[in-house]
Amino acid sequence: MINRAAVILKYKAPFIQWVNDADPYKDNPGITLESENKDCTVYLILEEDAEKLEEWISLNFEQLFESEIEDWYTDESLWPKNRNRKLFDEWIDVECHSVLIDTVDGKIIDDEI
C-alpha cells in the first residue's frame, strides 16, 4: 500500500451540458456523462486529508475545478463565471479511496506536467 488517498472527480449532468454548450466550434460529437466518467483524473492526496475530506475540498475546490475545466477549454472566456463551491458541488461528484496498492515492481515516475 502507498501512503496516499485517491480523490476522483466525476462529472454530473450540468458539467457535461456546459462542455457541449461552450464548444466554440459546435462540432463535438455530443459528449455524454457515461463516456466522460469512464476514465477520470485521479488526484493523490495525503492520507490525513482523506480523513478530513470536506475540509480538504473546501481548501482545494478552486484548483480542482479549474483543472477540470481547463482540460476541456483553455480559453478562459468560455469558463463559467461564478466558480464557487456551490457550483462545484452541482457539477462534480467527489469520490475518495484510502486504500491504494501499488502492484508494479518499479519506480513511480512523475512526468511533472
Residue map of PLM features:
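Generic structural hydrophobic/aromatic packing signal, biased to beta-strands
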Residues: 7-9, 42-45, 65
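Amphipathic protein-protein interaction modules
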Residues: 46-110
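Amphipathic alpha-helical interaction modules
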Residues: 18-60
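Short, extreme N-terminal segment that most often corresponds to the first beta-strand
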Residues: 1-25
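Extracellular structured ligand-interaction cores
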Residues: 4, 40, 85
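A generic structural signal for short, non-catalytic loop/turn and secondary-structure boundary residues
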Residues: 1-2, 35-38, 81
